[in-house]
């Protein structure tokens, strides 16, 4: 799972970014259609579903869907490395784990484009510097606001933090419910999926893995 990092070419306006960060700019260079073309595609889907896009209740739906997609998939226009770029070195000798638990997120599965709803737990062992806690949550949000698999988003969060902050290790746990499993196919409402990725010390020291998992689980019993 550690290798599931989707690499995209760097943004044309960011060619000066260091090579070690280029892979995390993550804005694909695509032939993005116009808003009008996107709205026309929604109209086609409405017709394919069996409805009439010209009826009163659906006349504004294509425009609303396109506007919603700009928000739901806004992560393609954001850079995780930039969010993690500002760090603090005055940590008063703190050398233990930093853990941000229960970060809620909504994403969409890349197979059926239906929602994934879950929480992420992110921990890291600082190596002389820390990052603002809100930045961890923003990194989760950036990757969540793209078409995803749970395995990929788990590894991407860990990979971005490891490569930009260079901590001693990163631990990420993601728990989520997939609507592609709840609303269609086997239709198992309430089934959840759990994925983890460990880097550095968390990968080589089982005791650190165990402590991370214990600290995450302690929030349930407290």
From Swiss-Prot:
Keyword terms, alphabetized: GTP-binding, Hydrolase, Metal-binding, Nucleotide-binding, One-carbon metabolism, Zinc
Catalytic reaction list: GTP + H2O = 7,8-dihydroneopterin 3'-triphosphate + formate + H(+)
Listed EC numbers: 3.5.4.16
Alphabetized NCBIfam families for the sequence: folE, PRK09347.1-2, PRK09347.1-3
Family in the record: Belongs to the GTP cyclohydrolase I family.
UniProt source species: Chelativorans sp. (strain BNC1)
Amino acids binding Zn(2+): 109, 112, 180
Protein name, as recorded: GTP cyclohydrolase 1
Disordered: annotated span: 1-36
Pathway where this protein functions: Cofactor biosynthesis; 7,8-dihydroneopterin triphosphate biosynthesis; 7,8-dihydroneopterin triphosphate from GTP: step 1/1
Pfam families for this protein: GTP_cyclohydroI (PF01227)
The organism's place on the tree of life at top rank: Bacteria
Hydrolase among keywords: yes
GO biological process assignments: one-carbon metabolic process; tetrahydrobiopterin biosynthetic process; tetrahydrofolate biosynthetic process
Quaternary assembly: Toroid-shaped homodecamer, composed of two pentamers of five dimers.
Entry's Gene Ontology molecular function annotations: GTP binding; GTP cyclohydrolase I activity; zinc ion binding
């Amino acid at each position: 799972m550690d290798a599931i990092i989707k690499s995209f070419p760097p943004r044309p306006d960011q060619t000066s970014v260091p090579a070690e960060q280029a892979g995390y700019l993550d804005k694909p260079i695509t032939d993005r259609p116009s808003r009008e073309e996107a709205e026309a595609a929604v109209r086609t889907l409405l017709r394919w579903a069996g409805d009439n896009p010209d009826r009163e209740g659906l006349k504004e739906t294509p425009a609303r869907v396109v506007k919603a997609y700009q928000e739901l998939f806004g992560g393609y226009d954001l850079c995780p490395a930039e969010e993690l770029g500002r760090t603090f070195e005055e940590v008063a000798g703190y050398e233990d784990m930093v853990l941000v638990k229960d970060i809620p997120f909504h994403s969409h599965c890349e197979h059926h484009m239906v929602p994934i709803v879950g929480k992420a737990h992110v921990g890291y062992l600082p190596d002389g510097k820390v990052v603002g806690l809100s930045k961890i949550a923003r990194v989760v949000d950036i990757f969540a606001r793209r078409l995803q698999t749970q395995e990929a988003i788990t590894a991407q969060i860990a990979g971005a933090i490891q490569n930009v902050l260079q901590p001693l290790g990163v631990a990420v746990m993601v728990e989520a419910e997939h609507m592609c499993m709840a609303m269609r196919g086997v239709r198992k409402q309430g089934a959840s999926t759990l994925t983890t990725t460990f880097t550095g010390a968390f990968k080589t020291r089982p005791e650190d893995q165990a402590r991370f998992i214990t600290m995450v689980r302690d929030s349930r019993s407290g």
